[in-house]
Amino acid sequence: MPSADLVLPAPMSRVAVVAPTSGARACLVELARAGCVELTGNLPPPEGEAVEALRRLGGRRRTNGGEPALLDRPPDLAALEREGRSRLLSGEIELQRHARLGLPHHSFTAWLGWTPATEVGPLNERLAPLDSAVVELTPPPWAEPPTQLRPVPIEQPFRPLVQSY
């Protein structure tokens, strides 16, 4: 009989994601694919051509509804609007909002965030081909990391107690 699962928080690391400014989009798309980095900062309001295209789609029948999606390369927004691709338009809007959280410095841009400590190495492997990297930072004393829960078998915490009898 399978055991029930207990969820415990995963240890989180404060990180900076650094990418060449020319490759910022590719870096953010890869971060979205990985799905394990929570960028920090106040997201700016949506703006731009993608927002207007999505608003115009509001009165028409949409296709591909659901979660936002991204393409590797910048899409033709007019074509997405004609095709009713609201998921891709929504994804572009979110990508642009997160891109504006970046802190540019010369030819690089950096984003601050949190990720599970176990994901730092795998993220660096994913970002290396894009000339990007994840750097662990010491969190400020006042910062409290977000909580990400991970399931663990319930009997593991009690195993020493049971084995002692």
Regions found by a protein language model. Give the residues of each.
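Long, charged N-terminal accessory/stalk domains
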Residues: 1-165
